[in-house]
Each structure stands twice: as C-alpha cells, then as structure tokens.
A protein has these predicted regions:
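Acidic, Ala/Val/Gly-enriched low-complexity intrinsically disordered segments
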Residues: 1-2
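A conserved mid-domain beta-alpha-beta active-site/ligand-binding segment of alpha/beta enzyme cores
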Residues: 181-191
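A structural signal for short, hydrophobic/glycine-enriched beta-strand patches
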Residues: 5-183
Length: 191
C-alpha cells in the first residue's frame, strides 16, 4: 500500500512538473514576437510563420551568445539551410527570419544578452527605445524552456499579456520528456 502511494505521489509530482514547465498558449494578434537567443532555427522559423500569418508587425530576436561558452556555439541543426559563420545568436536568428520571408524592417536588434534574463532585460530596452507599447506579445522559445522564459519576460513586461508559442528543436515534448535521460535532465534543470 505504501509503495503504491509513493508511486502515485511520484506520478502526481511529475505531472505537476510537466504542467509547470511546458507553458503554451494559442496565439492572438500581438504587438511583437520575442525569440530568446539560441543556436536552433526552429523558434525563429515558428516566429516567421506567425509573422507571415499576421500575428505581429515586429520580431525581436535576442542574444549575443551563451555566457558559459563565451562565443556563439554555432548552428545546432539544419546547417545545410542556415549554416554560416555568425558572431551572435541575433545574427543567426535574423538570417533564419530573412530566409523565412520576414522583411528586414520587421526585425528588431538585440545582440548583447548572454542568458535568458538578459534576453528579457535588453528586449525591454529595445522596445522602449523604439517606443513600442507592448500590450500583447508572443514568445517563441523551446518547449521545455517555456516557463522560465515566460517568467523572465513577465518581470520586464508586467502589464503585457504574453502568449507562449514554443517550438521543439530537440524532440523533448510534454508527452515524452520522461522517456530519456536527456529529457529528464532538460526539464528538471528548468525547476
């Protein structure tokens, strides 16, 4: 009996972790789409698709490179399409957006951030500089990075409704994250 209760508690705990980490919303018309920096094209591809569908007039990719590496880690997937020598995550993400039909004038620039909280901080500086009043925003990030990204952007945009529209570049989803060590490490690393 005690063993069964522990199993139920464990499963309930894992379900709660899942519900917390994997934030997701239906997109609505917004003032901007945010893309926190990374080396995967999928989040920028998702942002470009939402842009082309008319969800927002601007996209703000954000990122210099990871503070832990000290340089741009390089393109992590789809190198045959997006390969190149990029100095920053922003430069890479901008290229992905351009190749996916987003005009240059719709792409704002933030190329100093080295971790997620800085993505939010410096994005706020950019939107303030451009006098963009952000009442609603869409956030395109990794599936399991959704809650942390959302929390940081909410700190900097407390009056803004932020809709999370994640992409899944590495196959880690709400449905399968418990099946691999990589998935478990990625998700539990977010809490």
């Amino acid at each position: 009996e005690e063993r069964r209760n522990k199993s139920v508690n464990y499963n309930e705990f894992m379900k709660n972790v899942e519900e917390f980490v994997f934030a997701e919303s239906q997109p609505e018309k917004a003032d901007i789409i945010f893309v926190p920096g990374n080396g995967f094209p999928d989040m920028a591809e998702k942002a470009a698709s939402l842009y082309r569908e008319g969800y927002a007039p601007y996209i703000l990719p954000s990122g210099r490179y990871s503070i832990t590496l000290g340089k741009f880690a390089g393109v992590q997937s789809k190198k045959e399409i997006y390969g190149g020598d990029y100095e920053t995550e922003w430069e890479f993400l901008k290229n992905v957006l351009l190749k996916n039909g987003v005009p240059e004038e719709a792409i704002l620039r933030e190329d100093q951030a080295t971790f997620t909280y800085e993505n939010a901080i410096f994005s706020r500086q950019v939107t303030d500089l451009h006098k963009i009043q952000v009442k609603k925003a869409i956030l395109c990030c990794k599936t399991y990075h959704a809650r942390r990204s959302l929390m940081y952007y909410q700190i900097l945009y407390p009056e803004t409704v932020i809709m999370v529209c994640p992409a899944c570049p590495d196959g880690i989803t709400r449905e399968n994250w418990r099946e691999t060590e990589t998935g478990v490490e990625a998700v539990t690393g977010e809490i």
